[in-house]
């Protein structure tokens, strides 16, 4: 089974905010493949499991809030015996413009607290990521920016990135190597 973890903050207050880019991608997958509603797991996450083009996949949204995402993901990986190669984490990225996606095999957190939590809890940087650009704030604080919503000009551009990320994830689930996907999407 493959596991796709979307990072974000749980609760209606955070719906559709920039920091919830990961949630938006896994929600799009769940909708498009009619996987049903996310339900509470034994750990601090909501999940939905089903088939994407014949392959078993678990979509995960941690309920720990962004900065503690690893606390939810590690026990799920252990319980379901998910190898690091069968994990992809989807997150936002301040250092990329809205509408851009980047696939990355490993590395540091880049200042992203959700990724930092995953690295700390998993004990490794060796996991695949799909990052969606949310850009730096034009004015105001970074916190206000990441917890804010896309404006009317940015929204359709970001939605295009969500669909592009979804297509990359579908190809990965179907067996395309992550190296090939990086060549195609980066």
UniProtKB/Swiss-Prot annotation:
User: tRNA-binding: is it a keyword of this entry?
Assistant: yes
Signal recorded as keyword: no
Annotated GO molecular function terms are: peptidyl-tRNA hydrolase activity; tRNA binding
Give the source lineage, highest ranks first: Bacteria, Bacillati, Bacillota, Bacilli, Lactobacillales
Task: Provide the protein name.
Answer: Peptidyl-tRNA hydrolase
Q: What species was this sequence derived from?
A: Limosilactobacillus fermentum (strain NBRC 3956 / LMG 18251) (Lactobacillus fermentum)
Q: Which reactions fall under this protein's catalytic activity?
A: an N-acyl-L-alpha-aminoacyl-tRNA + H2O = an N-acyl-L-amino acid + a tRNA + H(+)
Write down the PANTHER family for this protein, in alphabetical order: PEPTIDYL-TRNA HYDROLASE (PTHR17224:SF1)
Q: Looking at its record, which EC class is this enzyme?
A: hydrolase
Q: Residues at site: Discriminates between blocked and unblocked aminoacyl-tRNA?
A: 9
Cross-referenced Pfam families, in alphabetical order? Pept_tRNA_hydro (PF01195)
């Amino acid at each position: 089974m493959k596991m796709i973890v979307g990072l974000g903050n749980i609760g209606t207050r955070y719906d559709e905010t920039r920091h919830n880019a990961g949630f938006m991608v896994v929600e799009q997958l769940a909708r498009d493949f009619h996987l049903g509603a996310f339900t509470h797991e034994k750990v601090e996450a909501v999940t939905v499991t089903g088939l994407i083009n014949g392959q078993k996949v678990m979509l995960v949204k941690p309920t720990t809030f962004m900065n503690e995402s690893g606390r939810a993901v590690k026990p799920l990986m252990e319980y379901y015996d998910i190898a690091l190669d069968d994990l992809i984490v989807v997150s936002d990225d301040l250092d990329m413009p809205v509408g851009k996606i980047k696939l990355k095999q490993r590395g540091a957190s880049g200042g992203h607290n959700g990724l930092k939590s995953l690295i700390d809890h998993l004990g490794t940087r060796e996991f695949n990521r799909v990052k969606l650009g949310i850009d730096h704030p034009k004015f105001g604080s970074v916190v206000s920016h990441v917890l804010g919503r896309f404006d009317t000009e940015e929204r359709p551009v970001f939605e295009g990135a969500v669909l592009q990320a979804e297509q990359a994830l579908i190809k990965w689930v179907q067996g395309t190597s992550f190296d090939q996907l990086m060549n195609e999407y980066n």
